[in-house]
Amino acid sequence: VVKPAIDSGITVVCDRFASATSAYQGYAGGLGTSTVEWLTDLATDGLLPNLLLVLDIDPAIGFLRKKGDTLDRIERKPTDFHQMVRQGFLYYAEQHPDFSEVIAADGTLAEVHDRVTQVANERLNLNLSVLGL
């Protein structure tokens, strides 16, 4: 689905891709990041993003911001697991600096929006508007 869209000139935005697989299964899940990245590379035929934005926040703060009371299977895992997932995303970004950017997500929604917009503008040569709040 992704590759044909890219090949036809469509811009694809994903909220989960290789970094999530590496962080959840490889780093926090114990399979090892090198094994998971090898399998992901095989499955995606080496496809990598132009830009990966890692919105970094302490999991405890993230859970306080979560809307609704229902937790899914992953959200019910212990805090240690979520800390490992966070470290997994940061590790992935560190290993892929050419296309990765870590953004502090501990500010207000407007502040995080502006950080994301500024990085996207710089890295992708765009001219998106910031909220400026």
Residue ranges and their predicted role:
Residues 13, 51-53, 101-103:
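Hydrophobic/aromatic beta-strand patches that form the interior of the parallel beta-sheet core
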Residues 1-12:
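Phosphate-binding/switch loop-helix module in NTP-utilizing enzymes
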Residues 16, 21-87:
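A glycine- and Lys/Arg-enriched "phosphate-lid" helix/loop adjacent to the NTP-binding pocket
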Residues 60-133:
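NTP-dependent small-molecule kinase module
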